[in-house]
Amino acid sequence: MAALTWRRFMNINKDLKAAVNMNPTRNTRNLTVENLCNMIDGGTLTIPLYQRDVSWTKQKCVELLNYELLGKSPISAISVNVINNTDSDFAVPQVSFIDREVMPNMVRGQFSVVDGQQRLTTNYKAFCNNDDLRDIVLDLGSGKFVITTENIRGNQVPVGILMNRDSGKLISYVQSKRGMDNDVMAFLLLARTKILSYAYTVNMAEDLSEDEQITWFEVLNNAGSRVSIIQMRFAKMKAHGLDIYTQYTNI
């Protein structure tokens, strides 16, 4: 009788029922650094407006680049929200990488970064030879990326040349250096291929609301080092034409 009563009167929350039938960990892809940088170039990989600005130091960028080139285990996954519902009343406004310009249009299937902005920005800055990384070089003597404080030496290659979207930039650079022969050229092309083909696991969710994205963001990105609510609010002001970072933080 007790078992019959349980089956007849025990109610299970409908949201719980739906949750146990969904496994979000199955929705993943592997994308290379080059794939991801090309998506940023094409505007199909963007940043939600609530994300704070880039916070990594140059040394952190060097550590990432060295791990991608020399590391023996994969780096943690990048997490994105796939925007299928592009209705302006639902979709969170997006900004571009580096300059954080508000994107006027969204396309169905666009990737919005929830976790991984710092890593993606570092790789993209190298891909487009951004001035921020001009003094980061691959030092062939020490066998790693370093920050140079003097003129670039003959056995060093700027990361923005090595990882440049145009492979011809690397070839021209090597040909201009008297001490670099064909063997060095072959090695550098191999190193370039290694780092641009480095694959990240990309975890994907679809059409998360802003609140759901922020919850995911906080779980992934703020554990142990919370980003303040005011930082998120400052970031969101960009949608209304007020860029708090460029207008006030450099005074």
Language-model segments: residues:
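Basic- and aromatic-enriched surface patches that contact anionic nucleotides/nucleic acids
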Residues: N13-N35, D41-S55, L65-I251
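Intrinsically disordered, low-structural-confidence terminal and linker regions
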Residues: M1-K17
